Amino acid sequence: TGKKPSNINLLVDKDANRPKILRALKLWLPKVGGENRDIYLFFAGHGLASDDGKNLYILPQDGDASLLEDTAIKRSEIVKLLQKTNPKSVTMFFDTCYSGQTRNEETLVANLRPVRIVADEQNMPNNFTVFTASANDQTSGSINEAKQGMFSYYLMKGLEGKADENKDKQITNHEMIAYLKTNVSKEAFMQNREQDPMLSGDPDQVLMKY
């Protein structure tokens, strides 16, 4: 089902900076979200992990990869801010990776050391679902012809109905991750690399009806 435009906060390009993202989470969302609502969050961009691998960050448009704590946003902070709204459910989509590389497999930080990521998705609250573009040690690639991330491209296709395996006019988390794994992994293989989308959450939960 569609969402009211007034209930959507779209931040792209230069608007996807740290102050505006935090403003949306801290000020805008509590006003429109309210208690017992379903919240959906989508982020496409760079991500990095802390040196000890315990904290995952998203890197806003104005972020500095060498100053994570000062200019990036912790995923755990995002979760806490979303929890404060007392939502019925939260579904998050992250088209990013935490390997320290760009979609073209260039290094975000000079002389970056390999980091073993130990952050645990299972620590998420029970009413949270998280779809991620790749495993923590993989790079999230793109489809050049579509000019967007591979995960984002197939996520949109899936939401259009292609992920509805049993054709019952609703898509479960299981159906979506199965569709993403099949298509993203196949597309990545054609680029001579590995990318496996991941799901943390209830696989039987209905993601959407149409």
Positions of predicted regions on the chain:
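Signal peptide-proximal N-terminal region
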Residues: T1-S6
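Short, solvent-exposed loop/turn elements at domain surfaces
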Residues: R18, L67, F131, Q138-S142, ...
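Extracellular S/T/G-rich loop segment that most often corresponds to the catalytic His/Ser-adjacent loop
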Residues: V90-Y153
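Short glycine/serine- and small hydrophobic-enriched flexible loop segments
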Residues: M156-G161
